[in-house]
Amino acid sequence: MKNGSGNTNTKLILLHPYIQKQTSTTRLWLLAFVSFFTIVFLLTLLYTRDTIPSKNTSVAAAVAAVVTGGSTPSASSPISNSNLPTSAINALLHYASRSNDSFHMSYGEMKSISDVLRRCAPPCNLLVFGLTHETLLWKSLNHNGRTVFIEENRYYAAYFEEIHPEIDVFDVQYTTKAHEAGELVTAAKEAAGNECRPVQNLLFSDCKLGLNDLPNHVYDVDWDVIFVDGPRGDAHEGPGRMSSIFTAAVLARSKKGGTPKTHVFVHDYYRDVERLCGDEFLCRENLVESNDLLAHYVLDKMDKNSTKFCNGRKKRSVSSLS
């Protein structure tokens, strides 16, 4: 546009792209920040729900810590002969049996194992197959003895040992399938005079049901109590508990010292695999207490030349677990 003086005034509107770029960059950073924390929150929620012990387990652990003074026995420290007070044991059983976890054991089942641990001469050697809701309970009840856990999931074993460094956990790889139980048990019975004999060092065993990849010292310990609550046995393609029950039977029969008897507990006894392997390797004449969920056997050590797990004697009188 021209004015009266003949000069041309041009007005320029400058657009500064930096302002737009700065606004866009800020929004992107804000979006990335919100997205990151949303993902972290969801992962934390899922991971906590699936793996962190329940509130009741934590309460039981807290009670145990108070009772034991927060100390745990080690190989370098002497083990005293004192036992947990009855009130502390009852508190542990109470909290553990009232968990919201649908897979927890009943009070009667836990008390049966607890009673045996209380009568066990210290230092008591306890071997447990499986990390479960009751893991901290077993460790606490046997606080003056040695407690070792065998777990099929190496990642969960590492995680559990990280948050509970006082727990001794070893992972093992099972090569069996639950649907192979009948075939494997038959083969083991046929080889009872050779690689699947009841008295042997499983570290050098070729028996398919024997666990031979545990730490060496596990085979050297004279176990007083063995509890089979793992591995997974409720799925057709799961490993089943044939190997853990067979291994428990051999460890009990192969003791070199300590007391001549070993208490072996088998959980989920109502299932076919647990009942079959219990009958064949732990033997009905050794069954002293049972219900649908828990069986309690008492096994004597055997002569090294033994070739039979069971002697065929009449079954003992069996009491019922409440």
UniProtKB/Swiss-Prot annotation:
Subcellular location: Golgi apparatus membrane
Topology relative to the membrane: Single-pass membrane protein
Chain segments annotated as transmembrane: 28-48
Main localization category: Golgi
Any GO CC annotation of this UniProt entry: Golgi apparatus
Coiled-coil stretches: none
Keyword annotations from UniProtKB, A to Z: Golgi apparatus, Membrane, Transmembrane, Transmembrane helix
Keyword Transmembrane helix set for record: yes
Domain of life of the source: Eukaryota
Gene Ontology biological-process annotations: plant-type secondary cell wall biogenesis; xylan biosynthetic process
Tissue expression as described in the entry: Expressed in rosette leaves, stems and siliques. Expressed in the xylem.
Name this protein carries in UniProt: Protein IRREGULAR XYLEM 15
Organism per entry: Arabidopsis thaliana (Mouse-ear cress)
Encoding gene (name): IRX15
